[in-house]
Amino acid sequence: MSLPSRTAMRSSCLSLAVLAALSCPVTAFAGDPPSDDADPQVATLGKVEVRAEKNGVEAERALTPGGVTVVDGETFEQRAVTNMADALRYVPGVFTQSGTGGDAIFISSRGSNLDATNYDSNGITLFQDGLPVTTADGNNHNRFLDPLAARHAVIARGANALTYGASNLGGAIDFLSPTARNSPTMQLFLGGGSHGQVAARLTAGGVSGNLDGLVTLDSLQRDGYRAHSRQDRMGLYANAGWQASDDLDLRVFATHVDSDEELAGPLTRAQFEQDPYQAQSSAISGNFQLNVKTDRLAVKGTWSPDAGNRLEFGLSYEDQDLYHPIVDKVMVDFDGPGPMPPVEVFSLLKNTDQRTWGGMLRYNARLGDHDVLAGLNVANTHESGGLFRNDGGQRNGLRTIVDNRSDSVEVFVVDRWTIAPAWTLVYGAQGVFTGRDVRNTDVASGVLRHPKDDYASLNPRIGVIRVLTPTSEAFASVSRLYEAPTTFELQDDVRGGDATLDAMHGSVAEIGLRGASNGPADATRWHWDASLYYAAIRDEILSIDNVAAPGTSLSTNVDRTVHAGIEALVGAAIPLGGGYRIEPLLSATYNAFSFDDDAVYADNRLPAAPRHAIRGEVMVRNDKGFFAGPTFDVVGARYADFSNTYRVAAYELLGLRVGFERERWEVFGEVRNLLDREYVGVFSVLDRASAGSAILQAGEPRSVYAGLRLRF
């Protein structure tokens, strides 16, 4: 019996990618239904270019022995998406929540970021067009990327981010920008809804020979569903490309984002039961805010001398100005009933400027049965400014001078070797070399805290992919994880002084299946992606809230922890006749995150992550562009402390989406939390919480949103 050749095997992977892209609402829609007066040549050429770009991303995914999800940015236009929590809703293994509906969100991938410093969102490396956005020390404190500025988002969970050079617990997320070559000449989006939300977005672009350019202006205002949670955001996103030759493309990206967001603060259980949407009193008196101005400039080039070789290179510079009142005055009456008035012992307003340089180099070569990818990421971050006393949102004297520096170099190589027909061996390694230099000077005493350390590790990976059918495959892999502490964690080391934390490290094993059914266009089509993983971690860095200075944290290394789980994404397109079909989609995650025979916490569950999280929808669609159906969320109970004494209740939500899509326009409406359930969205993590602990923030109540997009 003859066996398929390596070329046939690659074709099988591409077939899988194409079918998944055509059938999965998370990864792609089949395209706009043509209007009667549309130019068929223009429409076809546009779709061919977009699909070619998308299929390249999907083909890369098909050569990764682990959990990778591709989200099509076009799907964001059919529902209310204002932040990354909305955008990543259907990505299994990634748990995202917003405390007020604004940009400040909680995000965890495979159990990353489950502690009191969840505001820095470490454990996940963010990229934009392949260039690093996350700072050199690994934190994402100041901002997240705007998902509406992305053509696609690629989420590589855990060690599957090796092809991006990352080795951290949560993996990597890469947002790929649209260009004038894969977008309409002009688009206008208008949207709004509950809680005073008003959004507008205008995109214009053009192509002239070997030059192209695209500019987007974005505005979002919302009062928020809690008191003191208003957000005003203005953004400008632009890129220009030059096809210098048949082999060389160059592109420049520019971004400016100005976001001012009020923070409502957490509540006690009694306050939550009284009114879950009230603001914490100190959040109002302290005027808690997260105000960030961001400017970013990047250049990226692609050189493809032939079909078997491709070189990508790029540089980026980002400046972030942070103004962040976050702790109100903590007053202590030292003499009780005596004549002395209470004295302020602590308050906090952080005002810093953060500058990050980044660079990227990736070379892909196909050499016989080998598909080799080698790369380099470099980054350097300098944060300067101060920690001030907070007087109603105004600076009231400098407490600490901040001068933090970090740098990182990541080198990686991976070979996808077709060792036999239908079998691919994937092996490689990442090397990381990174430094931290934290300088915090107390103004009153002149004492300098100076934790400083260098970290290095070699992190190998080996896996295998077995093509089962032309449109399905199985995979397995074993990898090493490694993550150095952030500057936030070093400056909050529970030991104080100049002591430094150890880097987290461990090993993870993963197996899974992914694929799509292969049949006639009028048959039911299924697609699936499932992974099971187990990670044994040493020296995980966890932080608890500092009760002596609420709003700050204390960090330490934990001897052993376990991060294990099951991730599944399943969907279908079921014909009903008459041009109608049902498209169910289910994203399900099971988490088993715990301490491992810890001297203090034994085998307690890690906080913040639910045991299970299920999100999905059941859409009815027709060939004319109409769609409607329910959405649902089923989220299990979570612990709010390491001691497992404070349990946050599970919740279930029901929603509804409806819309209509045509060649030149589309409209949508969405109702969230249709039954108006009161539930906890995010919360602070303590060592041992009590009913009087102010840690709870409400999830979104019943809300209605609508949007209109016009294409010219």
Which positions does each model-derived feature cover?
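Extracytoplasmic beta-strand/coil segments of soluble accessory domains associated
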Residues: 60-61, 85-131
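Short acidic/polar hinge/loop motifs at secondary-structure boundaries
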Residues: 123-124, 131-157
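Transmembrane beta-barrel wall of Gram-negative outer-membrane proteins
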Residues: 185-187, 192-221, 226-264, 288-310, ...
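Membrane-embedded beta-barrel scaffold of Gram-negative outer-membrane proteins
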Residues: 202, 211, 310-328, 467, ...
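Structural signature of Gram-negative outer-membrane beta-barrels, strongest in the C-terminal barrel
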Residues: 245, 367-379, 402-535, 592, ...
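Face-selective signature of the C-terminal outer-membrane beta-barrel domain
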Residues: 246-255, 288-443, 477, 526-532, ...
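Gram-negative outer-membrane beta-barrel transporters
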Residues: 420-421, 425, 433-434, 521, ...
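C-terminal beta-signal and adjacent terminal beta-strands/loops
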Residues: 482, 533, 634-641, 660-712
